[in-house]
Amino acid sequence: MVKRKSEDAQLSARATNGKTARFAEATKSTKPVKKSATTKSAKTSTKPAVATNDTKSNSKPESLSIQIVTGSYERVLHGFAATVSETVFDPEASKEQDEPTYSDTFLFAAHSSAVRCLALSAPNEAHKRVLATGSTDERINLFNLSTSPPVVSDKPQLPSLSATSIIENPRNKELGSLLHHARSVNKLQFPTRGKLFSAADDNTVAISRTRDWTVLSTIKCPIPKAVGRPSGDTAGPGEVPTGVNDFAIHPSMKVMVTVGKGERCMRLWNLVTGKKAGVLNFDKSLLQAAGEGRYSSGEGRKLAWGEDGEEYVVGFERGAVVYGMVSDA
């Protein structure tokens, strides 16, 4: 019995030694397979990195789209888009890539008479702007313009004699017309997204709210006295030339200056109260320095404030004068 037990123990020990030896050989044989797999994956992972570098080097430069709107005496409102490559700001880029491409976006008769002025509002959250146009037909027409660049359509287009392509933007829509003035509209401006200022030959400046386009306030400028008949006067017999030529709003939105027909002065208005704050007359020496002759009207034609609001300029028929907030001229 003792001999049989010892023989059984030896057989079991041999069996266990054989199992451990086989397990050791199996583990040794699997190690090189794992190493070869890792090396292959490392080699394949480097290939996409080289491909991405090639695509970056061959990528085309991005482009900028600029929308331009013009109005004419032929009652036509013309909109077109200019696409410019961003390399135009790089002095080392070639000039051939800097040439812009143009495409018409809209072209139609917006008024029944000449277009006198245009104004664009700031974009809203939907990337849309309001375009206001003023005309001698006493109307202010409103349009909704999209700030996103027009997309070229794959649909067949009608033949055109124009040298530029035609790309219509379906997001552009007509909103309607405003009848806030009784005579020709000369100036439009959106100082903020919620306000529209308009000036006309009826000697008024109307302040409208863009939410519902109602008139919040109207500033009435005085009718000038008849002093001679200046050159270029188009008033009827027995009448005097009237109307607001231009206005300029201070960056603080508290002060506005206006110049009108038949007046050799500039008027200052308080936008908080809506009342006149002062008058600045143009003396003879100043008009002569600005190039105004003996038969000139001497009236201001254009106004503009500086960015900091410390200076403003008055434009005449043949020259301009820059004023400061402290000095006279």
Where are these regions (language model features)?
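Intrinsically disordered, Lys/Arg-rich low-complexity segments
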Residues: 1-65, 100
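Beta-propeller domains
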Residues: 70-109, 136-169
